[in-house]
Each structure stands twice: as C-alpha cells, then as structure tokens.
Swiss-Prot record:
Residue numbers on the Extracellular membrane side: 2-33, 98-109, 173-199, 284-293
Glycosylation sites: N8
UniProt name for this protein: Rhodopsin
UniProt region (Disordered), positions on chain: 343-448
The organism's taxonomic lineage, starting at the top: Eukaryota, Metazoa, Spiralia, Lophotrochozoa, Mollusca
Subcellular location, principal: membrane
UniProt note on tissues of expression: Retina, rhabdomere membrane of photoreceptor cells (at protein level).
Function, as annotated: Photoreceptor required for image-forming vision at low light intensity. Light-induced isomerization of 11-cis to all-trans retinal triggers a conformational change that activates signaling via G-proteins. Signaling mediates the activation of phospholipase C. Subsequent receptor phosphorylation mediates displacement of the bound G-protein alpha subunit by arrestin and terminates signaling.
Natural source organism: Todarodes pacificus (Japanese flying squid)
Amino acid sequence: MGRDLRDNETWWYNPSIVVHPHWREFDQVPDAVYYSLGIFIGICGIIGCGGNGIVIYLFTKTKSLQTPANMFIINLAFSDFTFSLVNGFPLMTISCFLKKWIFGFAACKVYGFIGGIFGFMSIMTMAMISIDRYNVIGRPMAASKKMSHRRAFIMIIFVWLWSVLWAIGPIFGWGAYTLEGVLCNCSFDYISRDSTTRSNILCMFILGFFGPILIIFFCYFNIVMSVSNHEKEMAAMAKRLNAKELRKAQAGANAEMRLAKISIVIVSQFLLSWSPYAVVALLAQFGPLEWVTPYAAQLPVMFAKASAIHNPMIYSVSHPKFREAISQTFPWVLTCCQFDDKETEDDKDAETEIPAGESSDAAPSADAAQMKEMMAMMQKMQQQQAAYPPQGYAPPPQGYPPQGYPPQGYPPQGYPPQGYPPPPQGAPPQGAPPAAPPQGVDNQAYQA
C-alpha cells in the first residue's frame, strides 16, 4: 500500500510543497514512531538549549575563561544553541506530534538553510579547536604567541563564511531543501540523482565533511603522539629533577593523558554524530535507493541533533576552569559529573600563573601553560647537558693516547698474584717524591 500523503503534505501557507516521489513508495510509519521521535527531539532541543546557554553565559561572564582558545568553544556553543532552538524544539517536535510538516514550503527552506549553516559550523568549529590544541601540544612554546583574540576572531569569521557558502547553494538552485524521512523536517535533497544535486552532495561530502575529518584526525593523532613522546622524556628526566619539579612534570603528564583520552572521545563523537548522514546521502546517490527507507533517513537526524548535547559536555565540562566556574554559579549541573581530588590537584599543579602585566590577547590557555612548564624543564635539562664539559676545559691533544697503548697483554695474566696483600693505608705510590720531614728535623738527615 502506498504512503498516504494527506497527513504529511502541508496544506497551510503553501499547498505546493514538494515531496519527493521516493517517499511515496513506503507505508506511513506508525503513530508511536512519530510520538517517540517528537519526544526525543524535544528532549534534545531543551537540553541542547539549556546546556549550551549555560556554556555561553559562563564563558562570557567569567574573565579567566575569556582566552583566545575559548572563543572557539563559545562559537561552538552558540552554533549548537541555535541548532537546537530552530532545528529541534519546537518546529520538528510540533510536526512530529501532528504527523506532518505544518509550516509551509518557505519555512522548510529556512529550516534547512539554518540547519545547514549551523551543522557545517559545528563541524568546522571542531576542526578549528583541533588545530588550536595541536598547536598547543605540538608547538607549546609558540602557541600563546600565535593564538590571539584577533587571530581566533579571523578563524571564526572563516568558519561562518565557509558554513554559509555550503548552506546557501540550495537556495539558489544548486541542490534543494526538501522534506525527508518521515516528512516532519527538511534537509538537503540527497534523493534526486540529477547532475546538480549529485555535484552538490559530493562537494559537501568532500569539503564540508571529509575535509574536517582529515583535519581532526591529523591534529588529534599528533596530539596523542606528542603525549607519548613527552611521557618518555619525562620518564628519562625523572631521576634528575628535584621533588617539586618532578611533581609538576607528573601532573603535566597526567593532564596530557586526560587530554589524549578526551581527544579520542571527540573523534568518536564526531563520527557518531555526522557519519550516518554522510552514509545515507552517498547511499542514496550511488547505492540501492530502496535501502533509503524513512527509518534509515530519520536515524541520522537523531544522531546529528544529539550532537548539540555532546559538545558542551566534552569541550566545556572537561575544562578545569570551566568546572570551577560552573560549580560556583550552577553547582547542581555537576552533581552527575564527579571529578576526583587527584585530577583537580593535577590540573592546578600543571597550570602556570599568568603575570598580571601580560595582555589578555597573549594569555595562554591551561593546556598551553601545562606544556610551557614541561618544555621549560626540558630546556633546563638540555642546557645543563650542553654546558658539559665546563668552560675552559682543554681537550686532550690529537693522537692521545698513542696508538697501541696500553700494550697488548698488559697487565700480565695473573697479576697481581692471588693473596697479594694490598699496600698499607697511606703508603705513597711507587716513584712518588719522599714525604716532608717532621718539624724540627734536618732534611738531609731525614733522607739519610
């Protein structure tokens, strides 16, 4: 039985909204699916707006969090906040409970356009965060000098322009925005197989999805490698450091290891959130079209919209200064996220205090401070090694010792003989000048 579109085509504002014929081939999904989807999207929207709203409030009101690197987190939180507000609750939630898109064709295009902008913005902002953290870990001594508020602002402007570039194409005929899945939300048209739609999908996949994936993988792979190398260097230096320096080095290594674990979580969350969309779009273009059912098309929507919840948890709650700020302002938020005392102590030990006279543009992040402290200790050890031998030490003359010295077979085998008593304590070596005579004794008489 074909799908009854009377409950899924909108008759408000614009009755000519386009529904791709592909979706007519499937039966209408049960009401329970609509209601479950509406509840899920509503919960994601409310939590996404609340969580990202708290992140934006704290990062803008807490001076210690207003560093250049944290501008990316604020931009990500703003992107996810808007994504949850417009593309989740209430538009899609209302449509799911009514079992049809009720907001018309123009609203469908605006909905898809906003979803495209902030979807691409979240992906590219995560790539910018990975670049910043790669600079902090891979080049810690130069990280605080290179990243400033101006540089971070320029990178964020690039992210916005990049996102608008890919989202605006369907508005002007390069692809299209249309209903998808259970016909309660709008997105890119990935079902049509004409050349315009296919080129749009391929370009978005390669440059809008796969490109940021390569950036994120490259940066976090090098972060993990840097963590491994620093741990080996710290182990080699441990014996030469005093107790205070060793404690700071161990704290920095612990902070690095936590950062590496967070990096793995970030990559996994990124793939979990956005890979299903990419797979379904490519499958619709190059695979069996009958595999793209309403259920298969709606699952990526759920994963992508849930990413607005993951991001503030991963990028913000893992930040030690953010945890401190949120515990003072909203202590109830962290009741489910307990951090042991050792982790908090390591974070404090690993951070370097910023002098009051420094400009806020050059203020390093906590990660940069940790790495600068470790690199300073490593440079100190390298300077000590470079200062040996001491200045003024004359090297031995060329050709010394002479070739063939000592002679082969020297000392002779069995020398000294077994049982040979050692010389008495204080005895002068053979050939040494005679000792001075006691006080009051004539030297010639003493030697005679």
